A protein has these predicted regions:
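Catalytic cores of nucleotide-sugar-dependent glycosyltransferases that transfer UDP/GDP/TDP-activated
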Residues: 1-140
Length: 140
C-alpha cells in the first residue's frame, strides 16, 4: 500500500494506455484509487502501421477487467490503444500540436476535457489544473 491516496494519476504516452482502465475498473473500489482522477498526456507519436495485436487487450482482461471494458482498445493499434485509454480518462493533456485527427475526433465526440498548456514548461498552468482536483491542502 502507498500509505496515501493520489488525487491525480497522470499517465504519459501509449505504454501507459492500460493504466486508466485498471484504475477505473479493477481498482475502482480500492480505497487508495477510488477517488483518483486520471490525466492522460498525448504526444505526437505513432506505431506507423504496426500493432500490438488483439492479444494485448485479451491479456489485460485476465485480471478483473471485463472484455466489454476493453472493447475500445480494439486492434491494439496506436490509435485504438489511445482511444481505449481515453475512454477511462478525466482530462487529456495535449502535449503536442500534431495529434492524430482520429484521436482528436474521439476526444471531441466523447466530451473529454482537454488541457493544452502553452508549453511543457508552463508549471503555473499545470499547478492550477492539478489544484482543481486536489481534495485537501498538503502540509509540509
Amino acid at each position: 500500500k502507498l500509505g496515501w491516496s493520489p488525487d491525480v494519476v497522470h499517465c504519459h504516452g501509449w505504454f501507459t494506455a492500460m493504466v486508466p482502465a485498471y484504475l477505473k475498473t479493477a481498482y475502482k473500489d480500492d480505497p487508495t484509487f477510488k477517488d483518483a482522477k486520471v490525466f492522460y498526456s498525448l504526444y505526437e507519436e505513432d506505431f506507423a502501421n504496426a500493432s500490438l495485436g488483439t492479444k494485448y487487450a485479451e491479456l489485460a482482461s485476465q485480471v478483473d477487467i471485463d472484455a466489454a471494458d476493453l472493447a475500445a482498445y480494439g486492434s491494439g493499434s496506436f490509435v485504438d490503444l489511445t482511444k481505449g485509454a481515453l475512454s477511462f480518462t478525466d482530462v487529456v493533456v495535449k502535449s503536442d500540436e500534431n495529434i492524430d485527427p482520429e484521436i482528436m475526433s474521439y476526444i471531441k465526440d466523447n466530451n473529454i476535457r482537454v488541457f493544452a498548456p502553452a508549453s511543457d514548461d508552463d508549471y503555473e498552468a499545470f499547478g492550477d489544473l492539478y489544484d482543481e482536483f486536489v481534495n485537501e491542502e498538503v502540509s509540509a
